[in-house]
UniProtKB/Swiss-Prot annotation:
Residues 541-577 are annotated as: Target nucleic-acid binding (TNB). Residues 19-53 are annotated as: Recognition domain (REC1-N). This is CRISPR-associated DNA-binding protein Cas12m. Binds only 1 Mg(2+) as opposed to 2 usually seen in other Cas12 enzymes; lack of the second Mg(2+) results in loss of target DNA cleavage activity. Mg(2+) binds at residues 317, 579. It comes from Mycolicibacterium mucogenicum (Mycobacterium mucogenicum). Disulfide bonds: none annotated. The lineage of its organism: Bacteria, Bacillati, Actinomycetota, Actinomycetes, Mycobacteriales. Residues 303-313 are annotated as: Linker. Residues 578-596 are annotated as: RuvC-II.
Amino acid sequence: MTTMTVHTMGVHYKWQIPEVLRQQLWLAHNLREDLVSLQLAYDDDLKAIWSSYPDVAQAEDTMAAAEADAVALSERVKQARIEARSKKISTELTQQLRDAKKRLKDARQARRDAIAVVKDDAAERRKARSDQLAADQKALYGQYCRDGDLYWASFNTVLDHHKTAVKRIAAQRASGKPATLRHHRFDGSGTIAVQLQRQAGAPPRTPMVLADEAGKYRNVLHIPGWTDPDVWEQMTRSQCRQSGRVTVRMRCGSTDGQPQWIDLPVQVHRWLPADADITGAELVVTRVAGIYRAKLCVTARIGDTEPVTSGPTVALHLGWRSTEEGTAVATWRSDAPLDIPFGLRTVMRVDAAGTSGIIVVPATIERRLTRTENIASSRSLALDALRDKVVGWLSDNDAPTYRDAPLEAATVKQWKSPQRFASLAHAWKDNGTEISDILWAWFSLDRKQWAQQENGRRKALGHRDDLYRQIAAVISDQAGHVLVDDTSVAELSARAMERTELPTEVQQKIDRRRDHAAPGGLRASVVAAMTRDGVPVTIVAAADFTRTHSRCGHVNPADDRYLSNPVRCDGCGAMYDQDRSFVTLMLRAATAPSNP
């Protein structure tokens, strides 16, 4: 058995994107847009097939009417709350909205039932349309690769990402959530890929093979400087930095039919094991403010880790609560003491016994993210003021041409994106008008604020995610079994929004703190670390444990009282912390002897 792993290498921040790479990103973007167009046309044709059946068409008419009623009532409720400056409004109006949503839900189910009746009859027509979609997608390969310059591995990567997005959207629709594919403009970001082909029985594509300048894959991917991981662990940090600075050579499509390569100055932080079988690599280019960043992701197959069979059982329950030190995102408990590193004890809190505690996202991260939001707010206000100035100037003067056409004040009044005004500032920079100086002064300041905003946000989120990875590493190094609850943060958030009576500003502040803490990210890091290190992971249903008192076993009612902490148990009358009770029950269920 083997496991897939991805090693990421950062590309030097001063590296300039070559024109051949920019062209490949542009082709990959156009391919993705064509795939979206084909999929949207397929969805429309599939809907037309269902609508051709009278019963389904009638159900769709009913659903459309119910949806229109629900939207209209939602707007009335929204307006009533604005006028009342409170969540508490007419009970009759809110009941009408609930009834409208219930009718819409029933109408959607009626359509699904009508489709189920004619599903077999429409099978041939659906299959024919699916075959046509597959043929259209296949034809794009000839357009972009055989007759164009896009590298075939990049084509496969874009197509795989597209199919993954289609499956995700189908799953969201099946759960009743609105979702659809959208077109995007090209901003210079994207992904290109290479794949290392190997015939059955051929030697593995090991790091040593890729480090060989005369190796089999030298014209696809060459990663020099490989160091055995055991030797790497014995090197100092300075030695690792120096040894890890290598230049990767990677295939990058073609220009007029001629193969092209690019050189990537990367920093390696860890090396793959000697027996790893490297299957390919992706160069991911992202845009941070107005600057491009790149990273190289190398994918490989490695042998499975030996499963862990000894160690304490650790239970982890997600949530979010405000504390003096930050936002508590989880409660944990172990059946044996855990050794928490000194540097993490302010984040992974532990009691005197060393068997339980909470995980807290430091308040400094919240303050840093709040600062970036304040910068974004300042930029938005400055943009509004600039828009008014440009509109006023255009109303009183004859405007210079913009993109070979006169620019109207009514057009600029509709602009919302800062990029539009930045483009206008560049276009009118040297025309000698008063408005050009105003535009350029705004652009010069906004560019700096945008960089501060995005870099500050990126660093704060990176700090949070790194803390989560460190916590996951601490648990995986010591635990023999990990229990994680299946609490859905999104569902809890939506439920809280529906029932809250707090002012909108207060609720938005709570939502921002929850989003900044991202409890789900901690669970993802823990599960990934356990899977990598061979530690068994069990997902525990949170449905009953959240309301059960661990001391007396009483299951309390599911009402709003139990959103606060602590609460009083209706069974024994004692006050208790429901989060600590939850992890206690998780451990008790895991260690209880199974019935024969």
